[in-house]
Amino acid sequence: MLRACKANNVRRLAITSSIAAIRSVRQENWPADNTFDESFWSDTSPENTTISTYNTSKTLAEKAAWDFRESLPEAERFDIVTLNPALIMGPAHQTNDFASGGIVRDMMASSGPVGRTRMGMVDVRDVAKAHLLALKVDAAKNQRFLLVSKCAWRKEMVECLAAEFNPKGWNIGTEERTDDDVFNYEANTTASREVLGLEYIPIEQSWIDMANTLIESGFIPRPAASQ
C-alpha cells in the first residue's frame, strides 16, 4: 500500500493503527500517572515477558509505515496520519464473533460480577469521522491521534446496559469482583479534540447502540421471556 501511494503520487494517507501500538500490556512500563498519549509506544522488546502478539503486530506495523516515509527522499515523501482507536463500540452488524461485540454479548448474558477493569473505548462512528478529518485537516499531517471517548470501568458498562435492558427481560449483573487485580489507565485525547476538532459521542450511547444492533442481527440472543 505504501509503495502504491508513492508510485501514484498520493499526497496523504490515513492509516488505522490501534491503542495497542501506544499502551503496553505490561503495567510496569506504564507512565507514573497511568495516562497515555501519542508520544508513547507499546513495548516490543524481547525482555518483555508479558509481550502481546497483538500489541507487537500493531506497533511494528505502524513503525514500519513511519520508517517507510522517512526512508524516502524528502521530495518524494507523502503525509501520513495514524489513527489509534481504543476498544471500538457503537453500531455493529456482524454475526461472526469479534472482540468488542463479545464483551457486550457476555455482559448481556451474565448476572454475575465483572472484573475490575477500566479501559479506553470509542464509537465506531467517531473512528470513521477521525479518518476523514485526518485527510482534510492540514495540521493533522504526519501526526498520530489517540482516539478515546472515555476510559470506563466494566462496572459502569454493565450498569448502563442493565438500566436499559433489564426492564426488557434481561438479567444483567451489576456487581464487581473484589478479588481481581485492577487494570486501570487514562487517555489524553487533547490532540484528537483540538487538532482534528473531534467531538466524541458519549460512550454510554455507544454501548446501547451496539447492544441494540447486535440483538437485531442475532449475535446477542433475546431473553426467552421476550421471544
Residue ranges of each PLM-predicted region?
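Glycine/proline-rich active-site loop of Rossmann-fold NAD(P)-dependent oxidoreductases
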Residues: 74-76, 90-103, 133-145
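Flexible, glycine-rich beta-alpha linker
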Residues: 21-27, 76-99
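Glycine-rich Rossmann NAD(P)(H)-binding loop
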Residues: 90, 114-117, 145-152, 180-181, ...
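Active-site Tyr-X1-5-Lys
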Residues: 40-80
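Mid/C-terminal beta-alpha module of Rossmann-like enzyme folds, strongest
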Residues: 128-178, 189, 209-214, 218-227
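Conserved C-terminal active-site "lid" loop/helix of NAD(P)H-dependent oxidoreductases
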Residues: 178-199
